Amino acid sequence: MEEAHNMREISIREIVVNHAVLSSCIDKCGDCFASEAARIKFDNDIEAIFELKRKRNAVILAHNYQTPEIFHGVADIVGDSLALARKAIDVDADVIVLAGVHFMAETAKLLNPEKTVLIPDREAGCSLAESITPEDVALLRQAHPGIPIVTYVNTSAAVKAASDICCTSGNAKKVVEALGVPKVLMIPDEYLARNVAKETEVQIISWHGHCEVHELFSASDILQLRENHPGVTVLAHPECPPDVVAAADFAGSTAAMSDYVTTKQPKRVVLLTECSMSDNIAVHHPDVEFISSCNLCPHMKRITLANIRTALEENRHEVTVDAKIADPARRAVERMLAI
């Protein structure tokens, strides 16, 4: 999914709070609209962010897992990791605010070294990115000499720098096959590697990293969903365990899931991924019933309207990449984008 928003300075609450298909999201919001003061702060944050973007010539890139008030309310560009990486190259702005997790902000910086890149919360990490280090990659090279290393973008810049090429969940199979070799290492997501291996003749050696959101889904969850919601279409992310992917009706990146709903228009659908994904695309599909069966990413949820506003007001927190690793990391990302 890749989409640009040019929002007028209106009350975004009218879009977010009053839209029936986002009621589940507002319910999850807890007490954030429990008082008039909270409502006023919400509107003030929205208005301030628009004014700060104008003053600083800033754009906000938001991942599909961001909450609807960010995704629909203040983001200029939204999408999955691949879409954000591609769009980051063409951003015409002095400042980029990355509403996502740290590896995404690093990727934006790699592709825009001359621009200021901010992440609203420096602690917005990723279990996959934390599952592997550059030292681990070096040991893998020693153990498998001559085997190309395909690295998921959900990694640090330092790990990317130690790799040959990057991939996303949306292009992993394409990247693996484009290398024209019989065997590759795919790191760090074990389940993504195993799921891709089922779709290609290329032999894939995997690492043991897992996404803490997607590893929680099980094939028994799908059986229960089908029993409770007859006729439901089940879409799974390829970071899910292979038995989950096998039991689903379709598996793909968040962009592919969105495209599936748009083109197939299932009457009833469940997305086995992060909760905000369903909330964000439901607004465009009022005739589709979205069944709730999701897991929250605590890292993505560290990004809020309030800390986006603070990031723009105080230039917090600027993302930098060490010069020694920036060039090789950038090459790994650019090789992916060239495919």
Curated annotation (Swiss-Prot):
The keyword Iron is annotated on this UniProt entry: yes
The protein's Enzyme Commission number: 2.5.1.72
Taxonomy, superkingdom: Bacteria
Cofactor binding mode and count: Binds 1 [4Fe-4S] cluster per subunit.
Residues reported to bind iminosuccinate: H63, S81, Y152, V153, N154, S169, H237, P238, E239, T254
Pfam family name, one: NadA
Cofactors named for this entry: [4Fe-4S] cluster
Chief location: cytoplasm
A GO CC annotation given for this chain: cytosol
GO annotation terms (biological process): 'de novo' NAD biosynthetic process from L-aspartate
Pathway given in the UniProt record: Cofactor biosynthesis; NAD(+) biosynthesis; quinolinate from iminoaspartate: step 1/1
Keyword Iron-sulfur: yes
Compartments reported by the entry: Cytoplasm
GO molecular function, one term: metal ion binding
InterPro entries, per database record: NadA (IPR003473), NadA_sf (IPR036094), Quinolinate_synth_type2 (IPR023066)
Top EC class, one word: transferase
HAMAP family linked: NadA_type2 (MF_00568)
Protein's job: Catalyzes the condensation of iminoaspartate with dihydroxyacetone phosphate to form quinolinate.
PANTHER family tied to this protein: QUINOLINATE SYNTHASE, CHLOROPLASTIC (PTHR30573:SF0), QUINOLINATE SYNTHETASE A (PTHR30573)
Family under the similarity heading: Belongs to the quinolinate synthase family. Type 2 subfamily.
Protein name: Quinolinate synthase
